[in-house]
A protein has these predicted regions:
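N-terminal accessory segments
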Residues: 1-7, 12, 228-237, 255
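Conserved ABC ATPase signature
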Residues: 46-50, 244-281
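Glycine-centered tight beta-turn/hairpin loop motif at sheet-sheet or coil-to-beta transitions
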Residues: 12, 107-111, 257-259
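Short polybasic amphipathic segments
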Residues: 5, 101-103, 123-130, 246-256
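Electropositive, glycine-dotted interaction segments
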Residues: 113-241
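Long, charged, glycine-rich C-terminal linkers/tails
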Residues: 83-86, 236-248
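Conserved P-loop NTP-binding catalytic core
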Residues: 37-42, 48, 52, 61-113, ...
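Pre-Walker A-like glycine/lysine-rich segment at the N-terminus of P-loop NTPase domains
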Residues: 2-66
């Protein structure tokens, strides 16, 4: 669950900017949108971002995608390193400084604070801390500067042997998520970050969001999805996915007046239906 997302010197955001999902104490109107972990703070399940034209809404969406994509691709040996491809600092400066991201998430009774600082050449800094939600105690998982990685006691024995193998352009989180380790901390944080979803108002034009999340929903929660589609009167009787041709395709089933079944490509459904499915995800 997302608690905070911070970015600095990315796209149009020169100064540190924070998206905070902590609910204010006076928030009483929609208690079903609150998550209560038994702590002093409660957290929003969903937040909507409004603003004037050119105020940064689309760039916030892009920044989240860059943050996630660097984590996904920083170990891949492509033609262009991920940090170079997604290093897009504030433009109106003669000398570009490092870009920075940080996220706080809660999973399995722990709050994790993870972030990294980077430029087009290397990872300048990276860190991961874990706070026990029951005791309030915070411990270091790892801290990285441009030349060294220091591990906390909980992972040091298992991870120390790999520290010299981590390339300067690769994130520690990405590196250890790829390995089969006894500790689950890297996989837990990686999964929570990948589950963070920022939906733009023109989301119907972005098939990547559906292709990434909808197959798992169809496989694991199809019954709930169909109940939801019935409740909003979408007219959809079934939904399926197929990637046999190396391209994810979604098909919806409708019942005609003649009681025959008719099949429709999901992207031929109305914008409202597609947006509703994305909100369900």
């Amino acid at each position: 669950m997302l608690v905070q997302f911070m970015l600095k010197n990315v796209l149009s955001f020169k100064e540190e900017t924070v998206l905070d999902m902590t609910a204010v104490q006076a928030y009483k109107e929609h208690e079903s949108n609150l998550i209560d972990y038994g702590t002093k703070e409660k957290f929003l399940r969903v937040a909507a971002i409004y603003g004037a034209n050119a105020s940064g809404k689309s760039n916030l969406y892009l920044a989240v995608r860059y943050f996630q994509q660097i984590i996904i691709d920083s170990l891949n040996s492509g033609m262009v390193p991920a940090i170079k491809e997604y290093y897009i600092p504030f433009s109106f400066e003669e000398h570009h400084e490092n870009s920075e991201f940080e996220i706080s998430v809660i999973t399995e009774d722990f709050e994790y604070r993870y972030g990294y600082e980077y430029n087009a050449e290397y990872i300048a800094a990276e860190w991961l801390y874990r706070k026990n939600m029951n005791t309030g105690r915070t411990s270091t998982i790892f801290e990285r500067t441009s030349g060294t990685v220091e591990f906390g006691a909980s992972v040091r024995k298992e991870c120390e042997v790999y520290k010299e193998q981590i390339p300067s352009e690769t994130l520690v989180l990405t590196f250890f998520n790829k390995l089969k380790l006894e500790t689950t901390v890297f996989r837990s944080v990686y999964s929570e970050i990948m589950n963070m979803l920022v939906v733009p108002t023109d989301l119907c034009e972005d098939r990547g969001i559906l292709e990434r999340f909808l197959p798992d929903v169809i496989d694991l929660e199809k019954g709930k999805l169909m109940e939801f589609l019935t409740a909003i009167d979408a007219g959809i009787k079934d939904i399926s996915c197929d990637d046999r041709d190396k391209r994810m395709e979604f098909t919806t089933t409708h019942m005609g007046k003649d009681k025959n079944r008719y099949f429709l490509d999901l992207y031929s459904e109305s914008e409202g239906t597609i947006k509703s499915i994305l909100l369900f995800i």
